């Protein structure tokens, strides 16, 4: 007796083997566990008698499907031109609680409820759009009154609106026709013999179409689309084989509703083209001003459209662009108009103007210096600049106030850079201090410090009296209109004579209060802290009299106090906020530079998110190193900041080029020239040295010193090659040449001079110009070692564990510690060991331990250069 596999039998009945196994268990009580199980012929016969043949099952299923197919969600989505997601939301809105997917079948009652809900929703949307349209028309009319040229364009658009509204009345009848079509489709499927009849009725509709075509040609597109849709049920009504059904089902699951929707939209665009789109655009009419230079992202913001949509519009035009790439303004104009905007192109010059060329009132407004309303102002900390002669104790005084040891880090105790610090007193009051360099070379920095300060503290040593730089500081403070408080320092020293200082200051119209004048003079000792509290109280007193206020709720403006190029963080600047609040992420312009605030740090190196008026912060995010003293102004966009900076720079370069051309044409044959390449550690030092060299050049009529290049950071190979090409001398201030630069200098025979004190630099240059150089000292590099590890030994100090990478390291040799190309220390090696033994020298490739004289701030990665000074005859 032959047996049949249950899997084969399941195919015959159009069932899965598990479903068939269930039927067998119900009829016979036998359990089937595998699709390969074979069934006796008797059971097969019983199943064939009991179960309906597969073909009949198929017909029944087909009838059921055909009867209910019109109510599947994906069909409704397709025919009603409503996205599946929107239909699903509408179903939830009418209280449909079952799970929803593309093939969910809805009963007739649910479909009717859904249809009524959608119709009601569309009516509400239509009313809302009409109201919005009226509001927009009013706005456009106002715009037209301002711009008469656009009246014709507006009239044309109004005519289009009327035409489209007429057409809309006909298009709105579409859902009813679709419903008739749906009913015809259901009847056609229930009564299969009448299919041909339904097809034969089509020509009647075509006749109607032709009559309408004579009256209103535009209706033809709509009617043809309806006729095209009637063919859909004809294609679907045909009987499908099981394989075709399976393929169709799989295809539908894969495709989902989205591809159909896209295809439909595309077809709709091709058939209907502009008319319906015009209606939508007219209803959403907006104004857009397109800048002459615009990026994809900026256009996205202007049109309030996603970036990917803008990029898609560009792709349609064959343009592949990134988000930050600029695009043709005409293309941007086309995109704007296609999305319902009245758009025009605005020229660059209409938006961004060079501040220096503006009238005074407009310039103040652009720089944020216009008068603020009283109700917006709040009290701000006073900004105090500390001024005075060299070594009169300015930095030591600040150290006493801040309880920090900044002076120990300065070269020879002389302040080389402006520092800015905000301190909080015990009474909760805050004061911002500027530590301005006191010696003559820093005149420009000191002048700059006076301008940003509210109060000047003039430090005069009680044992030294008034000096030339003291007088200069007085003049700067007076010219800036800054009140002066005199701190007579070093009263603890033998020979201190505060009364003598008062007499000398009286000659410069600084009369002490006890003599009937209005200048506050406080005798202090920065070393012991005597009377420092009294000095701070007087600063706060003057601050109250000045009524210092600012508006923290506006974009920030400030001044660049100091700037430098950090090897790891890029261009960095200390900014003193004078008005407004600076936030992380703000766009700004400062002189020729611009950028975005990437990060901010306070005077203690802590990161902050915002900076209020009177606060100094270190700002990261400049496109290049700004000039100290430049005005720092926050701008609303990157584009505006960038354009303003570029225009300023271009104007400056044009003026500079014209100036250089005049100098060369008039004096090139008549003067001797010395070309110099100048590199320094910070911007302030660079400016001070440049000014000193210019003053030196003026003393010698027959010699001109040209600084052909200057910059911040280590001396590089490109600097050496420039010097070789222009026969120039390289001068480094607190910076060193890197390895490639040293090698190139030897090969090209380029002279590199390194200095740590400005006086020495200027003195050497002056002697060279006079031809009076005495037998000079020359530096000879002995070797270089890299710090690998540090050891802190109690009572001894810091020992640096090093690897010698070049030459030899000798005990008692002079040593220079270089960190990121900047000289941190210059002294000598006091101890040199290999393991535990003292040695005289350590050669390349060996490890050693060494100590530096009076210096413990050594870090792994630092380079220590050992060198010696040899005497040479002057050439």
Curated annotation (Swiss-Prot):
Chain intervals for the UniProt region annotation (G1): 388-395
UniProt region (G4), positions on chain: 489-492
Comp. bias (Basic residues): 259-268
Domain of life of the native organism: Bacteria
Compartmental location: Cytoplasm
PROSITE patterns, per database record: G_TR_2, IF2
Signal peptide: none
Entry protein name: Translation initiation factor IF-2
UniProt organism field: Persephonella marina (strain DSM 14350 / EX-H1)
């Amino acid at each position: 007796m032959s047996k049949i596999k249950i899997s084969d039998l399941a195919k015959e009945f159009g069932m899965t083997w598990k479903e068939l196994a269930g039927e067998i268990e119900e009829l016979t009580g036998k359990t089937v566990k595998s699709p390969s199980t074979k069934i006796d012929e008797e059971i097969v016969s019983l199943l064939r008698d009991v179960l309906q043949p597969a073909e009949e099952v198929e017909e029944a299923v087909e009838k059921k499907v055909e009867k209910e197919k019109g109510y599947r969600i994906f069909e409704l989505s397709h025919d009603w031109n409503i996205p599946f997601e929107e239909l699903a939301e509408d179903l939830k809105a009418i209280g449909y609680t079952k799970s929803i997917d593309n093939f969910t079948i809805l009963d007739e009652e649910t479909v009717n409820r859904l249809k009524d809900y959608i119709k009601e929703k569309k009516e509400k949307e239509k009313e809302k759009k009409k109201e919005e349209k009226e509001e927009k028309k009013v706005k456009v009319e106002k715009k037209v009154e301002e711009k008469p040229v656009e009246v014709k364009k507006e009239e044309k658009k109004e005519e289009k609106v009327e035409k489209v509204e007429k057409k809309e009345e006909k298009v709105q009848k579409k859902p009813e026709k679709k419903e008739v079509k749906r009913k015809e489709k259901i009847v056609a499927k229930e009564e299969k013999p009448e299919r041909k009849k339904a097809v034969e009725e089509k020509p009647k509709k075509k006749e109607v179409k032709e009559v309408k075509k004579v009256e209103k040609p535009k209706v033809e597109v709509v009617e043809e689309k309806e006729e095209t849709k009637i063919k859909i049920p004809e294609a679907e009504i045909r009987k499908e084989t099981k394989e075709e059904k399976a393929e169709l089902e799989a295809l539908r699951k894969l495709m989902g509703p989205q591809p159909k929707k896209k295809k439909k939209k595309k077809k709709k665009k091709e058939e209907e083209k502009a008319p319906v789109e015009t209606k939508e655009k007219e209803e959403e009419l907006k104004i857009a001003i397109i800048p002459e230079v615009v990026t994809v992202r900026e256009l996205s913001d202007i049109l309030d459209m996603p970036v990917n949509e803008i990029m898609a519009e560009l792709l349609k035009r064959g343009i592949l662009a990134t988000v930050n790439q600029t695009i043709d303004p005409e293309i941007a104009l086309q995109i704007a108009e296609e999305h319902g905007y009245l758009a025009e192109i605005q020229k660059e010059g209409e938006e961004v103007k060079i501040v220096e060329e503006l009238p005074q009132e407009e310039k103040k407004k652009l720089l944020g210096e216009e008068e603020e309303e009283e109700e917006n102002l709040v009290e701000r900390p006073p900004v105090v600049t500390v001024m005075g002669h060299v070594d009169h104790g300015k930095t030591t005084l600040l150290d006493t106030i801040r309880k920090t040891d900044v002076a120990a880090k300065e070269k020879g105790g002389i302040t080389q850079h402006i520092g800015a610090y905000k301190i909080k007193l015990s009474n909760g009051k805050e004061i911002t201090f500027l530590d301005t360099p006191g010696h003559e070379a820093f005149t420009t920095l000191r002048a700059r410090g006076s301008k940003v300060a509210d109060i000047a503290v003039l430090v005069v040593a009680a044992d030294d009296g008034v000096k030339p730089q003291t007088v200069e500081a007085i003049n700067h403070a007076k010219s800036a209109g800054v009140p002066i408080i005199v701190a007579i320092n070093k009263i603890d020293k033998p020979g201190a004579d505060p009364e003598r200082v008062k007499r000398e200051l009286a000659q410069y119209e600084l009369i002490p209060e006890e003599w009937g004048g209005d200048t506050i003079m406080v005798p202090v000792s920065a070393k012991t802290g005597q009377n420092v509290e009294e000095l701070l109280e007087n600063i706060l007193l003057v601050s109250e009299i000045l009524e210092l206020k600012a508006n923290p709720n506006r974009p920030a403006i400030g001044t660049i106090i100091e700037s430098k190029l950090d090897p790891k963080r890029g261009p960095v600047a200390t900014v003193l906020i004078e008005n407004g609040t600076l936030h992380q992420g703000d766009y700004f312009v400062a002189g020729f530079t611009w950028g975005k605030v990437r990060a901010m740090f306070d005077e203690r190196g802590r990161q902050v998110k915002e900076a209020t008026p009177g606060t100094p912060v270190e700002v990261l995010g400049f496109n290049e190193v700004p000039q100290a003293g430049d005005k720092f102004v926050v701008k609303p966009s990157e584009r505006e900041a960038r354009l303003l900076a570029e225009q300023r720079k271009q104007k400056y370069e044009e003026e500079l080029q014209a100036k250089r051309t005049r100098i060369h044409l008039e004096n090139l044959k008549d003067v001797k020239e010395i070309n110099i390449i100048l590199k320094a550690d910070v911007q302030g030092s660079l400016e001070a040295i440049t000014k000193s060299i210019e003053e030196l050049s003026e003393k010698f009529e027959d010699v001109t010193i040209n600084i052909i290049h200057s910059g911040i950071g280590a001396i590089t190979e490109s600097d050496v090659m420039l010097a070789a090409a222009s026969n120039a001398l390289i001068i480094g201030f607190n910076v060193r040449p890197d390895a490639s630069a040293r090698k190139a200098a030897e090969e090209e025979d380029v002279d590199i001079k390194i200095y740590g004190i400005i006086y020495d630099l200027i003195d050497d240059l002056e002697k060279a110009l006079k031809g009076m150089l005495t037998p000079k000292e020359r530096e000879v590099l002995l070797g270089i070692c890299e710090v690998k590890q540090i050891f802190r030994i109690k009572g001894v100090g810091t020992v640096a564990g090093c690897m010698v990478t070049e030459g030899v390291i000798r005990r008692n040799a002079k040593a220079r510690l270089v960190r990121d190309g900047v000289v941190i220390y210059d002294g000598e090696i006091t101890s040199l060991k290999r393991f535990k033994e003292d040695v005289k020298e350590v050669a390349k490739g060996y490890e050693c331990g060494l100590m530096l004289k009076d210096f413990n701030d050594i870090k792994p990665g630092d380079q220590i250069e050992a060198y010696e000074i040899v005497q040479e005859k002057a050439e």
